[in-house]
Curated annotation (Swiss-Prot):
The gene is uppP. This is Undecaprenyl-diphosphatase. Coiled coil: none annotated. GO terms for biological process: cell wall organization; peptidoglycan biosynthetic process; regulation of cell shape; response to antibiotic. It comes from the Bacteria. Catalyzes the dephosphorylation of undecaprenyl diphosphate (UPP). Confers resistance to bacitracin. GO terms for molecular function: undecaprenyl-diphosphatase activity. It catalyses: di-trans,octa-cis-undecaprenyl diphosphate + H2O = di-trans,octa-cis-undecaprenyl phosphate + phosphate + H(+). The keyword Membrane applies. Bacitracin is thought to be involved in the inhibition of peptidoglycan synthesis by sequestering undecaprenyl diphosphate, thereby reducing the pool of lipid carrier available.
Length: 264
């Protein structure tokens, strides 16, 4: 892998992990389009490490409050929110563990990715247009958390988008756009930590090179910017921009995949 490729993929990870457009889809599609070889497990760890840095840098104060409240003050909003996030993490973690092999093989076909980009774009539009922006963080219930966590299990399929499906579920349950995004970002922390640690066991110090560092740095920086951008963007706007992007990108991928399939 070249440093340029690492930079491009790091930027894609930083954008796609937090914007509702699917990082896994784009990390499959870009090498497919340009004929790049699979970056390998080592670089997967680099990308997860980068996005972990970005989410930790943005939300570290909130996580300290949540953890501290869970340990010391039962019954508070922050303590409940910590355990809601733990509960919501379980379905996605279980599905990720059980279907890891399929996620790396069967699910990584451009045609399926194109279809899922469109399908989830339609669901996001429906949920965002149907529900009023009512619930804030303090109004999230245990049932809301569990349902959002269950939706996260579908993110094992590239094109669905972990952030996209959890924000869609949040909007369908009546969360405001900013609240749906914030809860999704907090929920991503244990998933990203778990995925990184699970893969980290196979990495040696010799695997850390310039491309690895470039991937970490670019995904971390772009990820931080993406989080900040989306939270501000959604205070006065809808998800329509991302819906249109998913529809257009999904259609383009399907057409291109079909053209390559039939030799055009």
């Amino acid at each position: 892998m070249t440093v340029f490729q690492a930079l491009v993929l790091g930027i894609i990870q930083g954008l796609g992990e937090f914007l509702p457009i699917s990082s896994s889809a784009h990390l499959v599609l870009v090498p497919w389009l340009f004929g790049w070889q699979y970056a390998g497990l080592t670089f997967d760890v680099a990308l997860h490490l980068g996005t972990l840095i970005s989410i930790a840098a943005f939300f570290w104060k909130e996580w300290i409050v949540l953890i501290g409240s869970a340990l010391r003050r039962r019954g508070t909003h922050e303590a409940r929110m910590f355990w809601y996030l733990v509960l919501a993490t379980v379905p996605g973690a279980v599905m990720g563990y059980l279907l890891e092999e399929q996620a790396e093989t069967v699910f990584r076909t451009p045609l399926l990715i194109g279809i899922m980009l469109i399908v989830m774009g339609i669901f996001l539009y429906w949920a965002d247009a149907k529900k009023p922006a009512v619930k804030g963080m303090r109004e999230i219930s245990m049932a809301d958390s569990l349902l959002i966590g269950l939706s996260q299990a579908f993110a094992i399929i590239p094109g669905v988008s972990r952030s996209g499906v959890t924000m869609t579920a949040g909007r369908a349950l009546g969360l405001s756009r900013e609240t749906a995004a914030r809860f999704s970002f907090l929920l991503s922390t244990p998933i990203i930590v778990g995925a990184g640690l699970f893969k980290l066991k196979d990495i040696t110090p010799g695997d850390v090179n310039t491309a690895f560092i470039t991937g970490v740095a670019s995904s971390a920086l772009v990820g931080f910017i993406s989080i900040s951008f989306l939270l501000k963007y959604l205070t006065g706007r809808s998800f329509a921009l991302f819906v249109w992007y998913r529809l257009v990108a999904g259609l383009a991928v399907i057409v291109l995949a079909a053209a390559r399939q039939f030799g055009f």
